[in-house]
């Protein structure tokens, strides 16, 4: 399950954050991070209903020395999640 996964330190927009690698999540969702550039509002569904998030595009993320560029959502989440949109870029399998 999600809570048995070890948190990893990832670099997002030049900042270090602890996050879980979740192959079951489509999106990468973080809280308490300031990212550069413009954002647009988005609603995402999760456990307990929908939440409003800010969507930042073309954000550089570094996971275990591998780099990916993609969309990062910022909003209230119980834990920072690195989803499939980033994991597939670094060659992480989805099983």
Summary of predicted features, one role per range:
Residues 1-10:
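Charged, flexible boundary elements
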Residues 11-94:
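Aspartic protease
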């Amino acid at each position: 399950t999600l809570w048995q996964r070890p948190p990893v330190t990832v670099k997002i927009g030049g900042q270090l954050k602890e996050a879980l690698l979740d192959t079951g999540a489509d999106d990468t969702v973080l809280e308490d991070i300031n990212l550069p550039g413009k954002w647009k509002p988005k609603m995402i569904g999760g456990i307990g209903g929908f939440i409003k998030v800010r969507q930042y595009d073309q954000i550089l993320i570094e996971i275990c020395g591998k780099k990916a560029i993609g969309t990062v959502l910022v909003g209230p989440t119980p834990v920072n999640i690195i989803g499939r949109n980033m994991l597939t870029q670094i060659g992480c399998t989805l099983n």
